[in-house]
Amino acid sequence: MDWLSRILSLWINLSPSLPLGVYHTVQSPPLRGAIVVVCLPRALGQFARDRGYLGRGPCAGGAGGVERLGKRIAALAGDTVETSAEGVRINGFAIPESRPLLTDSRGRLLPQRRGRMIVRPGEVFLLSTDHRRSFDSRYFGPVAVSDLVVVRNVLDDVTVAPCWSHRGR
């Protein structure tokens, strides 16, 4: 199935971190709020797969590879990101529902990245506020723009005429 999605430039999201659906690759610069898929660096991908956060897929990270991670871009190069026990602030604005957790759903300690940073050129900070237990840049830091692809939900590109629009003629 993954080979078919690569040929068609599709990505299927079944994770609660983003709206469920079928997404396709779009030629767009990585903008704040854009949904992207990314291959995590090998060691981080292996960590995520070993813990069951990600399944098998096309990215490097152990036998059988690791699936791509889908998230929204929260901060771009030059943005100031502050992560504390209370949550994430981007350029001084508190992001609702962004408090990092100490443990995952199985009680295992999560990596902790606290402090203030400025996102460097060529990087983005990924964050999901759709799901409280999302594994994102709060735990592993920014990711390289060169490792991500911007995607868009297929249904966002489909216009469906209401069923009543063709009646009465």
Q: What are these language model-derived features?
A:
Residues A74, R89-A94, S98, R106-R169:
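Beta-strand-rich cores of mature extracytoplasmic or soluble domains
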Residues P58-A60, L101-R108:
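Short, flexible loop segments at the rims of nucleotide/cofactor-binding pockets, characterized by
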Residues M1-R68, M117-I118, R138-R169:
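Protein maturation boundaries and topogenic segments
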Residues A34-V36, D79, E123:
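Structural motif
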Residues V38, R49-G52, A94-T103:
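Glycine-rich, pocket-lining loop/helix-strand segments that form or immediately flank
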Residues A63-E97:
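Mid-length scaffold segments of soluble, non-membrane domains
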